[in-house]
């Protein structure tokens, strides 16, 4: 029986499931995954501003420089800047007459 055709119906004044194979491990796993997905969706809707603000701004910071000497920090900054400058040379400048 397909999961899409299983319907809960009132049986003897209680809600029950007509399917006999509800103890099947695949059905149990699908139910657990569905419940977890629903919980994560609710949390996402409740805290989406905090979550996306963290990913937007929090991950833009570079690697931690705690405990690194200032000379090595400056060298790292120069390497990063030279990498950016090198990428600029890949663009073609087209001038219209």
Swiss-Prot record:
Keywords: Disulfide bond, Glycoprotein, Host cell membrane, Host membrane, Host-virus interaction, Hydrogen ion transport, Inhibition of host autophagy by virus, Ion channel, Ion transport, Lipoprotein, Membrane, Palmitate, Phosphoprotein, Signal-anchor, Transmembrane, Transmembrane helix, Transport, Viral ion channel, Virion
Residue numbers carrying Phosphoserine: 64, 82, 93
Pfam family membership, one: Flu_M2
Region (Disordered): 59-88
Record's subunit section: Homotetramer; composed of two disulfide-linked dimers held together by non-covalent interactions. May interact with matrix protein 1.
Gene Ontology molecular-function annotations: monoatomic ion channel activity; proton transmembrane transporter activity
Protein name: Matrix protein 2
Any one of the GO CC terms: host cell plasma membrane
Function of the protein: Forms a proton-selective ion channel that is necessary for the efficient release of the viral genome during virus entry. After attaching to the cell surface, the virion enters the cell by endocytosis. Acidification of the endosome triggers M2 ion channel activity.
Lipid-attached positions, S-palmitoyl cysteine: 50
InterPro entries hit by this protein: Flu_M2 (IPR002089)
Activity regulation summary: The M2 protein from most influenza A strains is inhibited by amantadine and rimantadine, resulting in viral uncoating incapacity. Emergence of amantadine-resistant variants is usually rapid.
Site positions (Essential for channel activity, possibly by being protonated during channel activation, and by forming the channel gate and the selective filter): 37
